[in-house]
């Protein structure tokens, strides 16, 4: 089962449907509707932290669950920022705001990017990013903007 933490964003269910299309069992819980212990007691194989309209510090159990998890965690938008923040990275305003804008990213071809060409086009919906120079050693950068390698995309 894949546990999706919903940070009150309409895009959450797009993710749920995409994951479901691959045959995965998905359970969705709101970020303030479950605590970390109960989330881990569900024994998810993977966790997805969804986008949302707030900062990582305001995203319920997101950061605490990231730190407590022993299974792979995928963070999308706010979830990505929460991973960086949970490990001590700084979340800052993006160099430019991109809501519904297409950008090219380059990636290392590993894991989630394994069968995706690099560079590739993605749609961005965020105004905050994890500052590259604040990223702790525990986290590896797997994707950046093609035209600005300082903007982390994975």
Regions found by a protein language model. Give the residues of each.
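N-terminal beta1-alpha1 cap of cysteine-dependent amidohydrolase-like domains
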Residues: 1-68, 78
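Structured catalytic cores of enzymes that bind and process phosphorylated ligands/cofactors
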Residues: 8-15, 19, 26, 73, ...
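Generic structural signal for residues in well-ordered beta-strands
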Residues: 26-28, 91, 141
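Short gly/ser/thr-rich secondary-structure transition/capping motifs
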Residues: 27-33, 56, 103-106, 122-126, ...
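Catalytic beta-strand/loop cores that center a nucleophilic Ser/Cys/Thr
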Residues: 111-154
């Amino acid at each position: 089962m894949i546990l999706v933490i919903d940070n009150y964003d309409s895009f959450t269910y797009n993710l749920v449907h995409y994951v479901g299309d691959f045959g995965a069992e998905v359970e969705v819980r709101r970020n303030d509707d479950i605590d970390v212990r109960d989330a881990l007691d569900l024994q998810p194989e993977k966790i997805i932290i969804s986008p949302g309209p707030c900062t990582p510090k305001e995203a319920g159990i997101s950061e605490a669950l990231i730190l407590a998890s022993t299974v792979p965690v995928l963070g999308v938008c706010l979830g990505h920022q929460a991973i960086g923040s949970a490990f001590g990275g700084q979340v800052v305003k993006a160099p430019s705001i991109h809501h519904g804008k297409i950008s090219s990213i380059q990636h290392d071809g590993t894991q989630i990017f394994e069968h995706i060409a690099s560079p590739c086009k993605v749609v961005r919906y965020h105004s905050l990013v994890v500052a590259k120079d604040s990223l702790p050693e525990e986290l590896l950068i797997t994707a950046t903007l093609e035209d600005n390698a300082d903007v982390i995309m994975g």
